[in-house]
């Protein structure tokens, strides 16, 4: 069981941040190696592990967003003015962009949970659907990355409409194989973000949803999960360490190349899943 928790933690740490779908890989690994398919509590634990990896890697940004946004709100309430420092304005704006980007996916998620039958989500978790999603959204990423070359690399160049569009795009990630980071990076590239800004904004935008979602899964308490609290903790620690390494590596890689390798991988892996689904 320890080995299973470690393997699933490694897969989560690697695939959560790469635009290749963590859900599909966790599911396939469990099937191929005949592991127990992880339940809500374990998945929430490893999700929090990767969330804390992001918080640590972007600690300066997270700290700046929280402190300067709070200070600006307090200043506005007290004096009706904004802070003038350039860095403070950047963090304040980034905080507001993340809020506006989070609101649509929360609202859409609530509507889905409220009105879409539970059977839809379980029915979508099959090899064929995952394979098609990997291929289609992989090609979209490649198209956006190749076609839209205009550089938008500054926080001040991001509009609130763009943050809403990128945030709303996260809802597609409920389809196994889409990839939350993949769809947000793709949308950002369609909006002419350069690769570094697209990845940075995508990762920061994921924090509110993944952190709150992970905490909710833990607060809801252990389900009938095969993995106990101890094994869930092991998975979370492993996903944290691996996730931290992957974030650092990805940001270095995209500063020198395109997303083409991820596109090739998604298409080939997707084709494999589609073919296997017929046997």
UniProtKB/Swiss-Prot annotation:
Function text: Catalyzes the dephosphorylation of undecaprenyl diphosphate (UPP). Confers resistance to bacitracin.
The keyword Amino-acid biosynthesis belongs to this UniProt entry's keyword annotation: no
Major subcellular site: membrane
Protein name: Undecaprenyl-diphosphatase
Gene transcribed to yield this protein: uppP
PANTHER family: UNDECAPRENYL-DIPHOSPHATASE
Enzyme class, broadest EC rank: hydrolase
Gene Ontology CC terms, in alphabetical order: plasma membrane
Regions that span the bilayer: 1-21, 39-59, 96-116, 128-148, 155-175, 201-221, 231-251, 259-279
Membrane topology: Multi-pass membrane protein
Annotated compartments: Cell membrane
EC number(s) per entry: 3.6.1.27
Top-rank taxon: Bacteria
One GO molecular-function entry: undecaprenyl-diphosphatase activity
Additional facts recorded: Bacitracin is thought to be involved in the inhibition of peptidoglycan synthesis by sequestering undecaprenyl diphosphate, thereby reducing the pool of lipid carrier available.
Classification via Pfam families: BacA
UniProt family annotation: Belongs to the UppP family.
This protein's record includes keyword Nucleus: no
Sorted UniProt keywords: Antibiotic resistance, Cell membrane, Cell shape, Cell wall biogenesis/degradation, Hydrolase, Membrane, Peptidoglycan synthesis, Transmembrane, Transmembrane helix
Taxonomy of the source species: Bacteria, Bacillati, Actinomycetota, Actinomycetes, Micrococcales
Alphabetized InterPro entries for the sequence: UppP
Catalytic activity: di-trans,octa-cis-undecaprenyl diphosphate + H2O = di-trans,octa-cis-undecaprenyl phosphate + phosphate + H(+)
A GO BP entry: regulation of cell shape
